[in-house]
């Protein structure tokens, strides 16, 4: 009658799914209007010319063109712009 009693239940064993954040279109890459350029939490990068920002801080292209990254101002803000093609 060798039986094993019930083991204790662990309170671990969960994990959340990855959020898939980051740059989706890189410098000099051609994008069409509405394309997502950057998915981010907060404004790590700011919208420049022809770039819009969604309510979750996603940056997207407003026009067709090439993606351009730049740094602006004393605070060193990263800007994402679209140069129309």
UniProtKB/Swiss-Prot annotation:
A GO CC annotation given for this chain: cytosolic large ribosomal subunit
GO terms for MF: structural constituent of ribosome
InterPro entries in alphabetical order: Ribosomal_bL27 (IPR001684), Ribosomal_bL27_CS (IPR018261)
Pfam families to which the protein is assigned, alphabetical: Ribosomal_L27
GO BP of this protein: translation
SUPFAM superfamilies the record matches: Ribosomal L27 protein-like
Keyword field: Ribonucleoprotein, Ribosomal protein
NCBIfam families according to UniProt: L27 (TIGR00062)
HAMAP family per UniProt: Ribosomal_bL27
Family of the protein in this entry: Belongs to the bacterial ribosomal protein bL27 family.
UniProt protein name: Large ribosomal subunit protein bL27
